[in-house]
Swiss-Prot record:
Name under which the protein is recorded: Forkhead box protein O
Pfam families: Forkhead
Gene Ontology process terms (BP): cell differentiation; glucose homeostasis; negative regulation of cell growth; negative regulation of cell population proliferation; negative regulation of insulin receptor signaling pathway; regulation of DNA-templated transcription; regulation of lipid metabolic process
Keywords noted in UniProt: Activator, Cell cycle, Cytoplasm, Developmental protein, Differentiation, DNA-binding, Growth regulation, Nucleus, Phosphoprotein, Transcription, Transcription regulation
Residue segments, region Disordered: 187-210, 222-283, 319-364, 580-600
Gene: foxo
GO molecular function (one): DNA-binding transcription factor activity
Organism: Drosophila ananassae (Fruit fly)
CDD domains according to UniProt: FH_FOXO
Length: 600
């Protein structure tokens, strides 16, 4: 049985176009095989939906055209036949082909409405016209097979601008559909037309690129003549800024590593990154400034703005006014913060800093100490001597102000700047923020010190020890304010407007000229002040009398309590023994006198 399998099996031959495959030989390559031209790969159409597109070189036969015209002539009698023939001739070369011919749903609806006598039809009348006049829809009038094409008709009525809806006059009736006379004639634009017409889109895109390249080679800065449509990506090769206010020096190229966005309408020239190709290096050798990271600058500007609104004290040379309510000098807010400038620019033109007293602001490598006390306005103030120890960025030395013994400790950063060596603008900005915060804290503390300190009487006021400067006092406003309080507040006026020569010479002072130019008699002022002092003294005497009376009443109460306690003690010690016996006898009934249980 096994010998039967050892026999030679017949060789099978496969013929391809009448040629046996075993006769080709083993060494013949695949490329040498004779292949029929019909087996070559065919180009796939854009859409495989029905109906299939016809070949490009296809020519319609004459009988088909005649039959199409004959079928279209049945659509509408009279004048509509010529319109249908013109539409067929216009759409003969169109790629949109339907089962009923070259006409679309919109064209059929247009002919249906145009064939009516009053040029208007309802939706049901349009359905009826389709079934009666179009052969394709004659057998599709039932509800099962008409759902698709009726839905298409409703969509075309709603989406096309050539149709307009008119409300029916009767109640409960459907609306009329009419042709819009304001609609543009010709082929209606579909929503996907821009994305489907790829050939026109590519041609337009290529023309835009060529135009940009020509302008770039010619060195033209303005692109006013280049106005392509919004759908074309004009900016894909555009890396110039023609009319930007930030780049008035002319058009310049962007960084070569800048990657434009993909072909989209959002990639316009106004949305490219405005970064130069070269780095921004300052002349003094510091690294380039990142303009996108401006949080520190914005924080400094907000800090200085808030300080200008909240603080009324600043470090200027002269004071502009005097407040009688608080006794502190008030000045206008400091100017806005300016970033530090290099030493070369400061040597060319130096301007006084809002935070310095005796000269221009030095560079940000060193900070000079102040030469005058900010609050006491004295060159020989002891605050300056105590504050010479220096200020480090990590530690702040607190001292007591000698002028106010009952005050809280305050920081030395209000009185002096330390000689701190900085490395760059970042350290300067950080130190400025720290000093401004310390300045606000110290000013608040010293304001409380002045308010809590006891006011000096007018008779103990010494003009020689008071550092008289260019202080101005509006005496009229001060008196009006004090009179409004009813004369119950103490007044402490530094005679700042008095001429220092008259004070030193000892000449009598009769009049004071205020800042408004009016003259005020000193005698009247002293009389008013004396009257206020008398009223205050009377008020103090009344308070002292009340306190004395209260003290006397308390003493009387204490004496009465002592007398009552001593009399009770005497009565207790002088009671006879009979009373004691009586009290004992009175308390005896409460004692249990019954015999014990074991007694019989």
């Amino acid at each position: 049985m096994m010998d039967g399998f050892a026999q030679d099996w017949p060789t099978l031959t496969h013929t391809d176009n009448g040629l046996a495959m075993d006769q080709l030989g083993v060494g013949v390559g695949v490329g040498d095989l004779p292949i029929d031209a019909g087996f070559e790969p065919q180009t796939r159409a854009r859409s495989n939906t029905w109906p299939c597109p016809r070949p490009d070189n296809f020519v319609e036969p004459v009988d088909e055209l005649d039959s199409t015209k004959a079928s279209n002539q049945q659509l509408a009698p009279g004048d509509s036949q010529q319109a249908i023939q013109n539409a067929n001739a216009a759409k003969k070369n169109s790629s949109r082909r339907n089962a009923w011919g070259n006409l679309s749903y919109a064209d059929l609806i247009t002919h249906a409405i145009g064939s009516a006598t009053d040029k208007r039809l309802t939706l049901s009348q349009i359905y009826e016209w389709m079934v009666q006049n179009v052969p394709y829809f004659k057998d599709k009038g039932d509800s099962n097979s008409s759902a698709g094409w009726k839905n298409s008709i409703r969509h075309n009525l709603s989406l096309h601008n050539r149709f307009m809806r008119v409300q029916n006059e009767g109640t409960g009736k459907s609306s009329w559909w009419m042709l819009n006379p304001e609609a543009k004639p010709g082929k209606s634009v579909r929503r996907r037309a821009a994305s489907m017409e790829t050939s026109r889109y590519e041609k337009r895109r290529g023309r835009a690129k060529k135009r940009v390249e020509a302008l770039r080679q010619a060195g033209v800065v303005g692109l006013n003549d280049a106005t392509p449509s919004p759908s074309s990506s004009v900016s894909e090769g555009l890396d110039h800024f023609p009319e930007s206010p930030l780049h008035s020096g002319g058009g310049f190229q962007l960084s070569p590593d800048f990657r434009q966005r993909a072909s989209s309408n959002a990639s316009s020239c106004g949305r490219l990154s405005p970064i130069r190709a070269q780095d921004l290096e300052p002349d003094w050798g510091f690294p380039g400034v990142d303009y996108q990271n401006t949080t520190m600058t914005q924080a400094l500007e907000e800090l200085t703005g808030s300080m200008a609104d909240e603080l009324t004290l600043c470090t200027q040379q002269q004071q502009q006014g005097f407040s009688a309510a608080s006794g502190l000098p008030t000045q206008p807010p400091p100017p806005p913060y300016q970033p530090p400038q290099p030493q070369q620019q400061q040597q060319q033109g130096q301007q006084p800093s809002p935070y310095a007293l005796n000269g221009p602001t030095p560079g940000y490598n060193t900070l000079q100490p102040q030469s005058q006390c900010l609050l006491h306005r004295s060159l020989n103030c002891s605050c300056l001597h105590n504050a010479r120890d220096g200020l480090s960025p990590n530690s702040v030395t607190t001292t007591m102000s000698p002028a106010y013994p009952n005050s809280e400790p305050s920081s030395d950063s209000l009185n002096t700047y330390s000689n701190v060596v900085l490395d760059g603008p970042a350290d300067t900005a950080a130190l400025l923020v720290q000093q401004q915060q310390q300045l606000a804290t110290n000013l608040e503390g010293q304001c409380l010190e002045v308010l809590n300190s006891e006011a000096q009487p007018i008779d103990e006021f010494n003009l020689e020890n008071f550092p008289v400067g260019n202080l101005e006092c509006n005496v009229e406003e001060l008196l009006q304010q004090e009179m409004s309080y009813g004369g119950l507040l103490d007044i402490n006026i530094p005679l700042a407007s008095v001429n220092t020569n008259l004070v030193n010479s000892g000449a009598p002072i009769s009049n004071i000229t205020t800042s408004t130019g009016t003259s005020l008699n000193l005698n009247q002022l002293q009389a008013q002040l004396h009257q206020q002092q008398q009223q205050q003294q009377q008020l103090q005497q009344q308070q002292q009398q009340q306190q004395h009376q209260q003290h006397q009443q308390q003493q009387l109460l204490l004496n009465n309590n002592n007398n009552t306690s001593s009399s009770s003690l005497e009565l207790a010690t002088q009671t006879p023994s009979t009373n004691l016996n009586a009290r004992v006898q009175y308390s005896q009934p409460s004692v249990v006198t019954s015999p014990p249980s074991w007694v019989h």
